[in-house]
Regions:
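Small/polar-residue-rich loop-to-helix segments that shape phosphate-bearing ligand pockets
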Residues: 1-46, 107-126
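Generic secondary-structure signature for well-ordered alpha-helical cores
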Residues: 10-18, 40, 44-48, 67-71, ...
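Active-site flanking residues adjacent to catalytic metal/cofactor-binding acidic residues
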Residues: 22, 77, 139
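Glycine-rich phosphate/pyrophosphate-binding loop at beta-loop-alpha junctions
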Residues: 29-115, 169-197
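Active-site-adjacent helical/loop segments in soluble small-molecule enzymes
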Residues: 104, 109-163
Length: 197
């Protein structure tokens, strides 16, 4: 796909156009700038935030947050979308910030991929149901559900301690709900126990 896209871009440039190829997952240093702004908003509203937990797909969201908050505050939960997530995030973050962001400096949980990208497994189902019951929030099983499972695991293993100011960034995922209708039905059924008020 990359070679074909470059060929088409070259043809368009010859005609005076200014094409831009949107990479897999939409992640590029340019796209990550949107999440720099998101991170700036988090920092302005919660200056003492210690952890921002986010799903790590193609890397742009995490890289943008790192651009605003630094590596020490951002915890990415790998969803299995790319083969070497730390390499991808380090490269995007380095390009975005203009400094050398190393893979060793990143906080990435690799324990929620389970059997593979988009394949539902028990910790994600538990996180989805617990979040629906406790907060009335439905999570998708591919991204936000895995991120919440990673947040819960980080609390269990002490990476995130009680009373530390933590933000969970729900990045959407509506299309991911349609491939897992039974799981979503269970999460929605859990909403019956939620009291809104």
């Amino acid at each position: 796909m990359g070679a074909v896209a470059e060929e088409v871009c070259a043809q368009l440039r010859e005609r005076g156009a200014r094409p831009y190829v949107i990479p897999f997952g939409g992640s590029s240093a340019l796209a990550a700038r949107g999440y720099v702004e998101s991170g700036d908003q988090i920092r302005m509203q919660l200056p003492d935030v210690e952890h921002v937990v986010v799903a790590l797909g193609s890397g742009g969201t995490m890289a943008g947050l790192i651009g605003a908050l630094g590596e020490d505050r951002v915890l990415g939960v790998d969803c299995g979308a790319v083969a070497e997530p730390a390499d991808v995030v380090a490269a995007l973050s380095s390009e975005l910030t203009g400094r050398d962001v190393t893979t060793a400096s990143l906080r990435i949980r690799l324990d929620q991929v389970g059997p593979g990208y988009g394949v539902l497994h028990e910790p994600v189902m538990e996180a989805m149901n617990a979040t629906a019951r406790a907060e009335g929030v439905v999570l998708d099983p591919t991204y936000s559900g895995r991120a919440m499972a990673g947040l819960m695991a980080a609390v269990r293993d002490g990476d995130i301690r009680p009373n530390q100011r933590t933000v969970f960034l729900h990045t959407g995922g509506l299309p991911g709900l349609f491939g897992h209708t039974q799981t979503v039905r269970r999460s929605v059924a859990a909403l019956d126990s939620v009291t809104f008020g």
